[in-house]
Curated annotation (Swiss-Prot):
GO terms for cellular component: chitin-based extracellular matrix. This is Cuticle protein AMP2. InterPro entries: CHIT_BIND_RR_consensus (IPR031311), Cuticle_Struct_Prot (IPR050468), Insect_cuticle (IPR000618). It comes from the Eukaryota. Arthrodial membrane. Residues 16-81 form the Chitin-binding type R&R domain.
């Protein structure tokens, strides 16, 4: 949309890995993100974005990106079937071990 105007463009960078920005246009496009240094040397991000679809509905995605990767959340994303009980139990065991500091190299 060539006629879209910028409504918000705010940026803050602390210079130490902490930052925040927010951007919005008159045609319904919006994004915001904050970043912090991660405990394992990575950058951690948390944010969201939205934009209008051709049918007039709004697509919206929020996300976290950290040492566990990019984790989006949206009603637009497909959802797989639930994990079988035995797989769920294995995931719980793995999470317990991770919390205890157990690693397998």
């Amino acid at each position: 949309d060539r006629d879209a105007q910028t409504l918000t463009d705010e940026r803050s960078d602390q210079g130490d890995g902490n930052f925040r920005y927010e951007f919005e246009t008159s045609n319904g496009i919006y994004t915001q993100k904050t970043g912090t240094p991660g405990s394992e040397g990575q950058s951690n991000y948390q944010g969201s974005f939205r934009f209008p679809l051709e049918d007039g509905t709004i697509a919206e995605v929020s996300y976290i990106a950290d040492e566990y990767g990019f984790q989006p959340s949206s009603d637009l994303l497909p959802v797989g079937p639930p994990a079988p009980p035995h797989v769920q139990r294995l995931l719980e065991i793995a999470e317990d071990q991770r919390r205890q500091g157990i690693t397998f190299d």
